[in-house]
């Protein structure tokens, strides 16, 4: 009984540390939140990806939007914020709730919501420091088109279990690609 309590206390301390020390120390808090979300996405796997190889698709993840040296910190944070909003929306659809374990889905929503809250707090600090356009229109459109392609794919595949597995794996890949934010 002591081990689960110790583990719970460690998680509470980590959670408090990540949300209480948000003096826009985003790379650390963002990394912790990403780890939690990625673990949940991994736990959501219901079928073997190898049984879905025929359903693979290149959704055209806009990696250039997340290249740290192209944008300053507020723009990069804004791009990640848009991505997390789109992921939240994707997993909030009716088709999604039928495809996944409800408990894991609720935990995913909570993790994504926490990420959005931290990013919004950091964005408001960053924008107060420098007046920079948050995200240029081309980058915003690239992220939205990427998620539109994913949504169309799911519709074409009639939200099949394999289609959701391909999308889950794609979201894990793209989510982990968006974790490196510029320090300055």
From Swiss-Prot:
<dbReference type="GO" id="GO:0002312">
    <property type="term" value="P:B cell activation involved in immune response"/>
</dbReference>
<keyword id="KW-0732">Signal</keyword>
<dbReference type="GO" id="GO:0002286">
    <property type="term" value="P:T cell activation involved in immune response"/>
</dbReference>
<keyword id="KW-1015">Disulfide bond</keyword>
<dbReference type="GO" id="GO:0005125">
    <property type="term" value="F:cytokine activity"/>
</dbReference>
<dbReference type="GO" id="GO:0002250">
    <property type="term" value="P:adaptive immune response"/>
</dbReference>
<dbReference type="Pfam" id="PF00143">
    <property type="entry name" value="Interferon"/>
</dbReference>
<dbReference type="GO" id="GO:0002323">
    <property type="term" value="P:natural killer cell activation involved in immune response"/>
</dbReference>
<feature type="signal peptide">
    <location>
        <begin position="1"/>
        <end position="23"/>
    </location>
</feature>
<keyword id="KW-0202">Cytokine</keyword>
<feature type="disulfide bond">
    <location>
        <begin position="52"/>
        <end position="162"/>
    </location>
</feature>
<dbReference type="GO" id="GO:0060337">
    <property type="term" value="P:type I interferon-mediated signaling pathway"/>
</dbReference>
<dbReference type="GO" id="GO:0006959">
    <property type="term" value="P:humoral immune response"/>
</dbReference>
<dbReference type="GO" id="GO:0051607">
    <property type="term" value="P:defense response to virus"/>
</dbReference>
<dbReference type="GO" id="GO:0005615">
    <property type="term" value="C:extracellular space"/>
</dbReference>
<comment type="similarity">
    <text>Belongs to the alpha/beta interferon family.</text>
</comment>
<dbReference type="InterPro" id="IPR000471">
    <property type="entry name" value="Interferon_alpha/beta/delta"/>
</dbReference>
<dbReference type="GO" id="GO:0043330">
    <property type="term" value="P:response to exogenous dsRNA"/>
</dbReference>
<protein>
    <recommendedName>
        <fullName>Interferon alpha-4</fullName>
    </recommendedName>
</protein>
<comment type="function">
    <text>Produced by macrophages, IFN-alpha have antiviral activities. Interferon stimulates the production of two enzymes: a protein kinase and an oligoadenylate synthetase.</text>
</comment>
<feature type="disulfide bond">
    <location>
        <begin position="24"/>
        <end position="122"/>
    </location>
</feature>
<dbReference type="InterPro" id="IPR009079">
    <property type="entry name" value="4_helix_cytokine-like_core"/>
</dbReference>
<keyword id="KW-0051">Antiviral defense</keyword>
<keyword id="KW-0964">Secreted</keyword>
<dbReference type="GO" id="GO:0005132">
    <property type="term" value="F:type I interferon receptor binding"/>
</dbReference>
């Amino acid at each position: 009984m002591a081990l689960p309590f110790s583990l719970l206390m460690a998680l509470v301390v980590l959670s408090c540390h990540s949300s209480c020390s948000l003096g826009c120390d985003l790379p650390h808090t963002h990394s912790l939140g990403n780890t939690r979300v990625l673990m949940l996405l991994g736990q959501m796997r219901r079928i073997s990806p190898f049984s879905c190889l025929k359903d693979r698709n290149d959704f055209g993840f806009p990696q250039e939007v997340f290249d740290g040296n192209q944008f300053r910190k507020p723009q990069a944070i804004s791009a990640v914020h848009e991505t997390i909003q789109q992921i939240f929306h994707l997993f909030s659809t009716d088709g999604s709730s039928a495809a996944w374990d409800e408990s894991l889905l609720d935990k995913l929503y909570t993790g994504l919501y926490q990420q959005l809250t931290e990013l919004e707090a950091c964005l408001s600090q960053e924008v107060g420091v420098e007046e920079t356009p948050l995200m240029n229109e081309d980058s915003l459109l690239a992220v939205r088109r990427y998620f539109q392609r994913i949504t169309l794919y799911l519709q074409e595949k009639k939200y099949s279990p394999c289609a959701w597995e391909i999308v889950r794996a794609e979201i894990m890949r793209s989510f982990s690609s968006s974790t490196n934010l510029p320090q300055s």
